[in-house]
Amino acid sequence: MTTLVSNNVSFTMLKCIGLRASALAALCALAVSALAAQRAPKPLDRSNMDTTCAPCTDFYEFADGNWLKSHTIPPDKANLGAFGMLGDQNQEIVQNIVRDDANLVRDGETKPGTNEWKIGTFYAACMDTATMEKAGFKPIKSELDIVAAAKSTDDIVKDFGGAGRRGGGGGGGGGGRGGGGLAPFGIGPQTDPRNSTVVIVSANQGGLILNREDYLGEGERAVKRRADYVEHVTRSLELIGESSNEAAADANTILNLETSIARISIPQADMRDPVANYHKMPLSDFAKMTPHIDVKRYLQQQGAKNVTDAYPVNVRAPKYFTALDSLIAATPVDAWKAYLRWHIENGAMATLSGPFRREAFRWQQVTSGVQVQQARAKQCAAATNGALGEAVGQDWVKRNFSPEAKARAAKMVDNLVSALRDRINGLDWMSQATKVQAVGKLNAFLRKVAYPDKWRDYSTLAIKPGSYYDNQRVVGEWNSERSWARVGHAPDRSEWSMTPPTVNASYSSSLNQIQFPAGILQPPFFD
């Protein structure tokens, strides 16, 4: 599916997003609009409008008609709009950074272990497709061998947390799988939704590659999507040595098992209810709920420390885990072995040899409508930014966003907070007790503008020349270890969840904070 979205509509969308998260966040966004560092299209350009169209008849055509007529979606993209166009502009700077650092590494002009060296080394490994061709699927061979050796479902379940960690590599989109495991559920650190001063463990449903509706739907689209998926899995399994008949049989087994998982999964609309999805309990109670899953072992495999029976876990979907436990017991071991083989391969395809990458892109064409694969340099620049985001971001803001602009933005946000405080205190319909609560929340409101005051320390991240797969695995494990180390402690409210070049903004209700990366503080959104 491809989509055209003009600057005019995207600007409106951004304001809606801001208002949904926080009225103050939207006001802040508008206030910093004067801080854009470079020229770009106007937020509202009348030349994009088709004024021959009556706005009350077709407002979309009225607002964007001429823009839609004058723009086409590039063959390497699924959509086109202001977010993506500004993102491309930001990514050009990222590409320059990673290429420059790779040249420094090549010429021996940067010291090993520095951020520049790690950026350049990671990027160079991603660009080194010759090494990937020689390796084939050898990087995941040890993982596949462990699955092949399993004799029982117990053997499979015991390794749910280990599969994808020991040698688990890069995700299908270029992001690291290392550290995530390949279980049909997700367990990881999360700020306690009812106590934002501590990080606990959250357990959630998972294990699906398609949308739940694609597995269960009876319509033409869902039926076709399942057929396309079976073809993709079949072709992929053939690449790791299965015969065409074996691969086809395994692909159907995998679809059937994932469909069973989809049936017991809670619909996403229901998963949005914060009250219905809060079930905090000690690990011992969670273990009783899932006797066929060694959850304590899983946590330890994932990197959790000091795991005891009292370890706090928020089980977001108890009914799912109860049903999953029964499904695990009832499903033959060979079905689980096929499932894990496929998920191990799928998680690593972007980091393996050409046939794997080409099949991954063919599937992307089927699901997104993209016609041409992005240039390798663009893919690797994005992957490097994903792996070393704040190291890249530190250089990005040096080139593209001044400290003075950040200071002015922060000052404007402070002024808006003061204005909102005055407005709250002046409301005649609000009780004094409520005003005290509202001002208290406002005073605790954390504003993150442009980029972090303190950059992430990558000194313990061991990037090495050579294998792109290994580097993605190391990044995934490093991030996982950092996250698990926070359990039982207060969340680090100074840490950002987005990198400086990101074209986005967010509000966290649990942490009461906004983020406006420098990447979005530019035209056409802010001028």
PLM feature spans:
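Bacterial N-terminal signal peptides that target proteins for export
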Residues: 5-25
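Bacterial Sec-dependent signal peptides at the C-terminal "C-region" and cleavage site
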Residues: 33-40, 177
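Short N-terminal segments immediately surrounding and downstream of signal-peptide cleavage
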Residues: 38-54
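Active-site-surrounding "flap" and adjacent substrate/cofactor-binding loops of secreted or lumenal enzymes
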Residues: 53-58, 62-131
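Structural recognition of the beta-strand scaffold that forms the well-ordered cores
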Residues: 58-62, 200-202, 513-517
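Short, solvent-exposed loop/turn elements at domain surfaces
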Residues: 67-71, 210-211, 524
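Intrinsically disordered, low-complexity linker/terminal regions across diverse proteins
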Residues: 87, 254, 260, 288-293, ...
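Noncatalytic, helix-rich "gating/capping" subdomain that lines the substrate-entry/channel surface
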Residues: 101-411, 415
